[in-house]
């Protein structure tokens, strides 16, 4: 029996190490258990590479078995300590090697040195410009590790790798000691190059870059390692602790052993995102009419605050386990926050963990500043009482005086937090430590009213929470839901699009690119198999950029702009079939371009653009300066954006096609043939038979649509109620009794229940719960295979697939892709396929590849090539490690050895099902989805116009006419309508009166003149249907709340100061309103 390892909790470091700020919470000083020692020989690293190749090539439902095989072989041959292996499988979660400070550019320079390449040679340029197209060259681009593999393979003389897993880990430790220079990295990488094959170096490079590209993350890996592993990881974020605590697969944790602990970072609970986010649906999902909590949504950084020793030691970390104690202070008297709040707790509070948001408070203007100012505020002006400072806004308490509170209901935790037992007069710490503003509600009306109040106080939105739920680490569900307001001139979401071209300006913008053509990427992501992505034109943007932005666009990219020839457009651009809307004066190659963030009022159909619709009144909100022209380094939180990371067509369709609808043949051209699945006729369920009430908002897929389940009994992991919720989540109805026509699908693991035996007497199929789990893992309802049936009717026994095993059925691989099509696995057994499919059925199969299946196919082809080059000795070692115990690509003489894996009715079944779900969830999180559309097989047909984001009503639309699409480049306020908050206008509209100063009146008169001169329309009534903005002076802002309330419908209006108008005129463009709200 395993024993717990003792832990010595070391306080987190507070100073910089080797001049570098720590990026992850420090690992715990951990003592290895006495019997958790590896006594066998570590395998050669190429064995792990073989497993990684298989993980990359296998379908999701096969990865769990492969992982359990890896871990089982390791325990048998090496020992119980799997940490050296798991840290290689999850490099981005390795806290002992948090950063290598090695990105693609540095690795490219190092390998140019190691391979003795001439700097300007083609090979060197392929490494340096690894994302750029290679013309007609067969060499891959877009995947740096694969580019390196090709260059190394062409020059390496290493036929068999010499390094073990232990040796590779030691070399990686050397690379991660801190920030080094190229001359320091080269000797270590050269040692790797001299002892590793090109294949091994490819995987080492992926480990260094912390992205293995195997579509599996911590949930899948840890679920295969141990049933309790993910629960423990969620509360400690420490792989070593997980591996050393759960080294014995037979040991199970008690519930109190997965509690939160002091000075251990954990993965916090996050907000879910609803497909249909109307306030009524949000209220239903959150439990209305039961009471719920509404909190103000804050624009800061999620932070955990740990304190112990009656305030002697403090620890701050982000939701991604980044340690910020060096900023805020580890001890009283230190940092930009701890020194001011160290005395805030009651004397009897020995230790505590708080969850909250770190904001920036400006004491001069008495308001919170933008999130981007947080780090500078935390670093500077420790002793300046007038300078902006960090302010921790608390919304939850999770630990108190050695007791974890995460399993207490939210209502209890809230009551304790505000009881006066935690803080001494927290109001005395205003601007440093505060409660999040919150209120109770019971319906959509309460949400609407509180949202209005938050907007009136210049807030961002709400978070609505259920009161009767526990705190769930690393969860993003409907227990917490985010609510944001909508404004009259913009949609709820901004888009990140790539610039494809531009038009020369006139007048004041003469000689500059004044309008930009932007597009959406066709490839969903960079898989390294194409030279570069192609783009469909989407919108043109000429507003929102300042004078300096136009200068940067012209000067930094002067050599990249090329004349556009309408008769011979560049091949990467897919244009609209009609008109000149997307025919620019100049274009720019994607690899030289940059990404901009755009907001707009709505989406409208438009045949003049390649995608078939465009944005109405688009405005540039932010420019992501490309790496080559940036004059500064990105910080830890920043994300590089380029042609591979800009918004894709699929991303766009996902964002603006909610709620999702399954495609059917009635939706127009480009019809997709589907394999027919025999399903029970939908019945109208009498309310008494429905059982628990579940919201339609919880439905995420249509796997079981048109099916009704009668679940008699569940499993230990999924009791009856949970199983009902699961099938509902995937589109099914459920009933508490069999339907009159006996069409409800009966689910039970056995026939012990009298209700089940009654169904059997009527000849009704009784199906095991595993059928549900396996169907979800494959994203389609499986046929009734014998191994899933407790009792089979004569009709089921006559079924085509009844006597096939799941393994045999998988060879045909009717795995539903994300667009609803069925796929034939090219590696499927041809004989089996012919045996169970007739010609007519084959014609019904849509053989268009989904993105993930294409990646797996290419990975299998790559695997075949690599396996064909194995030496006899390597093949023997692979066989000993289970890599050749089943059919490897190209082998035909080996058979699967997993016949019994699903037939054994034991705890292994439920663990396997749980593991399959974890693998599936990892794939969902790790990639951009492919979505329903009516695009044809060739991909050239237009998709259906999104369901939401499109406005089919002319009333209340922006613009002087429904045909207006863009802001005017010369008259920047044209198409906008302004109400000026003067005392005279207030009287006309029945608003509160005021006596503004002469200066205030003068400023508003001047602003009105500027608006009219630059195309704006001034409205005297706040009820004007076209109203978009309200101008309010800082010195007469008493009507802010009143105007916010009275102009909220149908969408809210921007309330800005006269300074916004003046700065827009100076910059000759529309600027971001968020920076100009009245005080």
UniProtKB/Swiss-Prot annotation:
InterPro entries: Adenylation_DNA_ligase_IV, BRCT_dom, BRCT_dom_sf, DNA_ligase_ATP-dep, DNA_ligase_ATP-dep_C, DNA_ligase_ATP-dep_cent, DNA_ligase_ATP-dep_CS, DNA_ligase_ATP-dep_N. Its EC number is 6.5.1.1. GO terms for molecular function: ATP binding; DNA binding; DNA ligase (ATP) activity; metal ion binding. Residues 838-847 have a biased composition (Acidic residues). It is an enzyme of class 6 (ligase). Residues 1-20, 838-942 are annotated as: Disordered. GO terms for biological process: DNA biosynthetic process; DNA recombination; double-strand break repair via classical nonhomologous end joining; double-strand break repair via nonhomologous end joining; nucleotide-excision repair, DNA gap filling. Gene3D superfamilies: BRCT domain, DNA ligase, ATP-dependent, N-terminal domain, DNA ligase/mRNA capping enzyme, Nucleic acid-binding proteins. Its cofactor is Mg(2+). Its main location: nucleus. It comes from the Eukaryota. Mg(2+) 1 binds at residue 357. Keywords: ATP-binding, DNA damage, DNA recombination, DNA repair, Ligase, Magnesium, Metal-binding, Nucleotide-binding, Nucleus, Repeat. Mg(2+) 2 binds at residue 460. Residues 848-878, 900-914 have a biased composition (Basic and acidic residues). It catalyses: ATP + (deoxyribonucleotide)n-3'-hydroxyl + 5'-phospho-(deoxyribonucleotide)m = (deoxyribonucleotide)n+m + AMP + diphosphate. Residues 699-789, 968-1078 form the BRCT domain. It is found in: Nucleus. ATP binds at residues 295, 297-298, 302, 357, 395, 460, 465, 482, 484. The active site is at 297 (n6-amp-lysine intermediate). Belongs to the ATP-dependent DNA ligase family. DNA ligase involved in DNA non-homologous end joining (NHEJ); required for double-strand break (DSB) repair. This is DNA ligase 4. The gene is LIG4.
